[in-house]
UniProtKB/Swiss-Prot annotation:
It is an enzyme of class 3 (hydrolase). The gene is ureA. The keyword Transmembrane does not apply. The keyword Mitochondrion does not apply. This is Urease subunit gamma. GO terms for cellular component: cytoplasm. Its main location: cytoplasm.
Length: 100
């Protein structure tokens, strides 16, 4: 199978998000890459599901709380930018203050 660099990157993000969600379910506090991957995948899947940009931003902002992440992670992630594919094309989505 031949994958483009972008496809490889997406695959890595999805794989990390899968591991991170399993850790979250077990009550393990998430680190920076795990938190970013969950927020990113939530935004990408929301766009794929046909949601609006505003709906995607709100959903991605509500997927994690301070209790889900290690100390200091919230301050490391002031925003997350994701290029998501919506039904009408690709858009850059910025999720401000993604961990509440």
């Amino acid at each position: 199978m031949q994958l483009t660099p972008r496809e490889v990157e997406k695959l890595m993000v999805y794989t990390l998000a899968d591991v991170a969600l399993k850790r979250k379910q077990r009550g393990v506090k998430l680190n920076y890459p795990e938190a970013v991957s969950i927020i990113t995948v939530t935004a990408m899947e929301g766009a794929r599901d046909g949601k609006t940009v505003e709906e995607v931003m709100n959903e991605a902002r509500s997927v994690l709380t301070r209790d889900d992440v290690m100390d200091g992670v919230v301050e490391l992630i002031p925003n997350v930018q994701v290029e998501a594919i919506f039904t009408d094309g690709s858009r850059l989505v910025t999720v401000h203050d993604p961990i509440q």
